[in-house]
Amino acid sequence: FLMPREMVSLPFELKVNRSVPFSEERLFMCFDELGLEHELYFKRVNEVSGGQRQRIMLAVAALLNKPLIVIDEPTSALDTGSTDKVLAFFRRQAEKGAAVLAVSHDKDFASGCHYLIEL
């Protein structure tokens, strides 16, 4: 099984992302914002819950410094406290200049977004 630290590094190895330096320090800052323990980084993926893996990859998406973050069901495997942290995390990304487009069936999460389109 992969370890989260191996999962996290993969996007930075793609040619399109090679100009973005990977920083464990920045990753752990994101972990703190998302309520993740630093030791998760060193566990095996099968020892990390689905909700924790989801938040780890949200941190990676933010580290790539893209102008648009597109996320499908970012809170589907999360409890209310973690959902609130994810919403606050996305708001901080928006304050830093990123646009965040999220698809969600979670009405509580959606109600915390700046703009809402219901289908």
Residues of each region from the PLM?
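Catalytic Walker B motif of ABC-type/P-loop ATPase nucleotide-binding domains
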Residues: 69-73
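Conserved ABC ATPase "signature" region
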Residues: 22-39
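Hydrophobic anchor residue at the start of the ABC signature
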Residues: 58-59
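H-loop/switch region of ABC-family ATPase nucleotide-binding domains
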Residues: 103-105
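Helix N-cap at the start of a conserved alpha-helix in ABC-type nucleotide-binding domains
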Residues: 80-82
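Q-loop/switch helix immediately C-terminal to the Walker
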Residues: 2-17
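Conserved ABC ATPase signature
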Residues: 44-48, 52
